[in-house]
């Protein structure tokens, strides 16, 4: 039972909220219960860090590799809840149900990082995905009804990605006679000279690419980010990346290091994601849509670490995923606090933010600088390591193009910074009052993005150690 403790805590939490939907669906204490539950999940994840073992006949593995992701997910869930401003953007009558799906989605992600066969990975992926589909639809009613459109698009794209993934799984099983990752890693490298093996492996990646919003499964991101409530967008934009990168690294060990065609496919997806995301972000007026296209580009950067096909590259990819999650949570935290009513935040709405709340402005600017890859923040450290690793692996042209994309992204990030410091004399801006918890969250996010950028050694060592148990 100790091996399954974080997942058990999440399952019990979901059951508690299910009971609360019957007894106190509108209780103001729901958010407090959720915060306490997230702290419990973090504690149970930390307690299980040194545990190893297998469950369910080898389909579920507990190791340092899986447990480090569970700690990240636990901390991330707490930050999302702090970002959520008591989830005011969610329909009041469904708020208790929202918490159920929130914790079930995290449970699915935790199951993803521990799954050791492709069928278990699919089940965990679907648990997380279907919970998130419902979360998107539970936004407070919008005159344009964009939340319903976003939920339908999210569902349709997700089902399509799952269909591709299942198709690839069926061929892999037919070729190797196994669905477990260990036998697949033994047999698949010998089959990678066959077109059907390459095709099936590429199809297998569809579900992961969907979670990372990578080309060609990125189309859902802008509409879902725009249509979902700020709290839901903050979740969908961040925590699923942990589950996706954990599974993608496991998949990357299957074909062996000499499959040049797979490397070329990953390179193509990474570069197209970067160019498409950054070019589309240049013309966005809605802040959440801008961050969606930015996320597509950052997914391409994460892929640079994976296509190196060695632990050092995997370490860099995990570190950059952690950086991306922190940077985006910081941005969405600010977006949630300054959004008025149920409206989406436009770029022009950021005008005079520094005058209204210097601390919020500094938090937002720190997140933007980190996303842009400006030193000394965590985004710079992560990008530098990814580019250095890709260059060492011989991908010179890719590194040059990725560097160009970094320069391209500077334009729209620095434009947001400019607007934040601008003031509109004709429009009276009321000061934003922050509570003690909001101030503490701002300081925590700023400190995390700065200190992990300057002193990354400790977390990199922990990730390296975890990768030895992959």
UniProtKB/Swiss-Prot annotation:
One of its GO terms (cellular component) is plasma membrane. The chain crosses the membrane at residues 2-22, 30-50, 62-82, 99-119, 155-175, 201-221, 234-254, 261-281, 290-310, 318-338, 360-380, 395-417, 443-463. It is found in: Cell inner membrane. It is a multi-pass membrane protein. InterPro entries: NADH-Q_OxRdtase_suN/2, ND/Mrp_TM. It comes from the Bacteria. Its EC number is 7.1.1.-. Keywords: Cell inner membrane, Cell membrane, Membrane, NAD, Quinone, Translocase, Transmembrane, Transmembrane helix, Transport, Ubiquinone. It catalyses: a quinone + NADH + 5 H(+)(in) = a quinol + NAD(+) + 4 H(+)(out). One of its GO terms (biological process) is ATP synthesis coupled electron transport. GO terms for molecular function: NADH dehydrogenase (ubiquinone) activity; NADH:ubiquinone reductase (non-electrogenic) activity; quinone binding. Belongs to the complex I subunit 2 family. NDH-1 is composed of 14 different subunits. Subunits NuoA, H, J, K, L, M, N constitute the membrane sector of the complex. NDH-1 shuttles electrons from NADH, via FMN and iron-sulfur (Fe-S) centers, to quinones in the respiratory chain. The immediate electron acceptor for the enzyme in this species is believed to be ubiquinone. Couples the redox reaction to proton translocation (for every two electrons transferred, four hydrogen ions are translocated across the cytoplasmic membrane), and thus conserves the redox energy in a proton gradient. This is NADH-quinone oxidoreductase subunit N. It comes from Desulfotalea psychrophila (strain LSv54 / DSM 12343).
């Amino acid at each position: 039972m100790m091996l399954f403790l974080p997942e058990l805590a999440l399952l019990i939490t979901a059951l508690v909220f299910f009971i609360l939907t019957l007894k106190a669906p509108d209780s103001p204490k729901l958010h407090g219960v959720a915060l306490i539950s997230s702290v419990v999940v973090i504690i149970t994840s930390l307690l299980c860090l040194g545990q190893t073992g297998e469950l369910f006949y080898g389909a579920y593995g507990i190791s340092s590799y899986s447990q480090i992701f569970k700690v990240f997910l636990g901390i991330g869930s707490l930050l999302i809840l702090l970002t959520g401003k008591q989830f005011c953007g969610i329909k009041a009558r469904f708020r208790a149900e929202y918490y159920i799906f929130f914790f079930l989605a995290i449970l699915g992600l935790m199951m993803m990082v521990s799954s050791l066969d492709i069928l278990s990975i699919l089940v965990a992926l679907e648990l997380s995905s279907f919970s998130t589909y419902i979360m998107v639809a539970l936004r407070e009613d919008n005159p344009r009804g964009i939340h319903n459109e976003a939920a339908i698009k999210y569902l349709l794209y997700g089902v399509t990605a799952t269909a591709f993934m299942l198709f690839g799984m069926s061929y892999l099983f037919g070729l190797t006679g196994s669905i477990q990752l260990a036998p697949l890693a033994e047999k698949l490298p010998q089959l990678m000279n066959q077109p059907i093996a390459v095709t099936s492996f590429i199809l297998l990646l569809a579900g992961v690419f969907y979670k990372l919003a990578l080309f060609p499964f990125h189309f859902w991101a802008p509409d879902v980010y725009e249509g979902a409530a700020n709290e839901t967008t903050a979740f969908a934009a961040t925590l699923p990346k942990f589950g996706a990168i954990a599974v993608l690294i496991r998949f990357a060990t299957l074909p062996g290091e000499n499959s040049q065609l797979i490397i070329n496919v990953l390179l193509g997806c990474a570069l197209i994601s970067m160019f498409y995301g950054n070019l589309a972000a240049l013309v966005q007026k809605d802040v959440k849509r801008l961050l969606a296209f930015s996320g597509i580009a950052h997914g391409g950067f994460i892929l640079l670490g994976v296509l190196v096909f060695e632990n050092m590259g995997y370490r860099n990819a995990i570190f950059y995923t952690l950086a991306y999650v922190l940077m985006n949570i910081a941005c969405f935290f600010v977006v949630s606090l300054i959004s008025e009513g149920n409206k989406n935040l436009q770029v022009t709405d950021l005008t005079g933010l520094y005058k209204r709340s210097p601390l919020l402005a500094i938090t937002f600017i720190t997140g933007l600088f980190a996303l842009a890859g400006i030193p000394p923040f965590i985004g710079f450290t992560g990008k530098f390591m990814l580019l250095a690793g890709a260059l060492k692996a011989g991908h010179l042209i890719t590194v040059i193009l990725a560097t160009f994309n970094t320069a391209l992204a500077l334009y729209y990030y620095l434009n947001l910074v400019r607007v934040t410091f601008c003031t509109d004399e004709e429009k009276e801006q009321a000061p934003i009052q922050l509570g003690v918890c909001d101030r503490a969250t701002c300081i925590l996010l700023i400190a995390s993005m700065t200190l992990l950028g300057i002193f990354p050694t400790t977390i990199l060592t922990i990730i390296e150690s975890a990768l030895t148990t992959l």
